């Protein structure tokens, strides 16, 4: 009985996958709460442990240069990418029941969207931070079935040649059904309906067996009203802020 030892420090850290859907996640919560207090439970996303991800808060809220520009008046769009140049390797049994949407979008990419879009907490503590993250999720514009068809793309990698080596198709991987429709790629266009981000599209994408391995956030700023440095065809190189999370951390 962990709750019967007030002098002991007992914590439980829970990583993904935390259930298969909303109902199973709620059932797991009830199981844990029978033996632990809420303050002893840590449901973590290991992406938040990456140094560059943690630095997003300082970049935004301790920076007098970027924060005044961090809104719909100056930002045209936001792109968040997390792709890998390898397949599922030996994780077939897990991955075919999960897919890219559950494996990456609803946790890792959702956290990156929240860190990019959230309002500054009044103080830097876990509860206030979480409250601002929740506000972002509550502001996601719901999608109708028709909008899902237009704004969401799901894909699955096929056989290919990569650096002179043959790469198997997803359906040829170990423990994968030959008719599997599990996605290994997801891209979607999101909108956050609040004062700061109204009308600014957030593009997120993730996938296996892509041409490169990279996780990054790209902030695309709006062009200047008068293009002094336009090229002969009238175009200009857009201003971007790139936050590279991996493989080479940097801004």
Describe these PLM feature segments.
Residues 1-251:
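Secretory/organelle targeting and membrane-embedding segments
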């Amino acid at each position: 009985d962990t709750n019967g030892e007030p002098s002991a420090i007992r914590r439980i850290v829970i990583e993904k996958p935390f259930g298969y859907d909303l109902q199973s996640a709620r059932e797991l919560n009830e199981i844990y709460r029978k033996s632990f207090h809420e303050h002893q439970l840590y449901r973590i996303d290991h992406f938040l442990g990456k140094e560059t991800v943690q630095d997003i808060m300082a970049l935004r809220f301790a920076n007098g240069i970027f924060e005044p520009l961090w809104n719909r008046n100056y930002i045209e769009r936001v792109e968040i990418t997390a792709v890998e140049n390898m397949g599922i390797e030996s994780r077939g049994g897990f991955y075919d029941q999960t897919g890219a949407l559950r494996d990456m979008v609803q946790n890792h990419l959702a956290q990156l969207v929240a860190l990019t879009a959230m309002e500054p907490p009044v103080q830097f503590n876990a509860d206030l931070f979480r409250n601002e993250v929740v506000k972002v999720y509550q502001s996601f514009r719901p999608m109708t079935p028709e909008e899902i068809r237009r704004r969401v793309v799901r894909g699955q990698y096929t056989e290919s040649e990569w650096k002179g080596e043959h790469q198997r198709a997803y359906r040829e991987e170990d423990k994968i059904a030959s008719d599997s429709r599990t996605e290994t790629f997801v891209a979607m266009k999101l909108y956050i309906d609040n004062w700061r981000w109204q009308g600014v599209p957030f593009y997120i994408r993730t996938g296996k067996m892509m041409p490169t391995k990279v996780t990054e956030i790209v902030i695309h700023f709006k062009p200047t009203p008068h293009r002094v440095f336009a090229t002969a065809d009238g175009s200009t190189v857009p201003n971007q802020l790139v936050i590279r999370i991996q493989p080479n951390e940097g801004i």
